[in-house]
Curated annotation (Swiss-Prot):
F(1)F(0) ATP synthase produces ATP from ADP in the presence of a proton or sodium gradient. F-type ATPases consist of two structural domains, F(1) containing the extramembraneous catalytic core and F(0) containing the membrane proton channel, linked together by a central stalk and a peripheral stalk. During catalysis, ATP synthesis in the catalytic domain of F(1) is coupled via a rotary mechanism of the central stalk subunits to proton translocation. Component of the F(0) channel, it forms part of the peripheral stalk, linking F(1) to F(0). The b'-subunit is a diverged and duplicated form of b found in plants and photosynthetic bacteria. One of its GO terms (molecular function) is proton-transporting ATPase activity, rotational mechanism. One of its GO terms (cellular component) is proton-transporting ATP synthase complex. Disulfide bonds: none annotated. It comes from the Bacteria. Keywords: ATP synthesis, CF(0), Hydrogen ion transport, Ion transport, Membrane, Thylakoid, Transmembrane, Transmembrane helix, Transport. F-type ATPases have 2 components, F(1) - the catalytic core - and F(0) - the membrane proton channel. F(1) has five subunits: alpha(3), beta(3), gamma(1), delta(1), epsilon(1). F(0) has four main subunits: a(1), b(1), b'(1) and c(10-14). The alpha and beta chains form an alternating ring which encloses part of the gamma chain. F(1) is attached to F(0) by a central stalk formed by the gamma and epsilon chains, while a peripheral stalk is formed by the delta, b and b' chains. It holds the Pfam family ATP-synt_B. Coiled coil: none annotated. InterPro entries: ATP_synth_b (IPR034679), ATP_synth_b/b'su_bac/chlpt (IPR002146), ATP_synthase_B_chain (IPR050059). It is found in: Cellular thylakoid membrane. The keyword Plastid does not apply. This is ATP synthase subunit b'.
Amino acid sequence: MINLTIVLAVEEVAEKGGLFDINATLPLMAIQFLLLAFVLDKIFYKPLGKAIDSRADYIRENQVKAKERLAKAKQLAEQYEQEFAQTRQKSQVVIVAAQAEAEKIAATKVAVAQKEAQVKREQAAQEIEKQKEVALEQLEEQVDSLSRQILEKLLGPELVR
């Protein structure tokens, strides 16, 4: 009896139309599905795929270019840093040389100035010595003259000569 109920239930379902009715609509639905898939492929999926592929290629190319630019920028930065270090070393050498030259020039000028000062000091000492001798000679003359005057006053003018 249970078997009979199942058979009757299946027959009723088959008569009313079930999930898969095998009739002319099934191949029509399959053809519609294939046609829709074909149209979507031509109109939507291929252009979308091409757009996605071209965008991916564009991004990939830009990434490669960016990596190249970054590598070039790093290389240039390293090169500039090396050149800057070399320039700094050269400038330090030039500064040291200039300082040495300036010290040499200053030492030479100081030596020349000291020699000039020594010469002027010696000239001044000679001048002072000459003036001293002249003053002493004048004083001797004055002393001689004053001594005679004193003697003349004390002894009289007749005895002094």
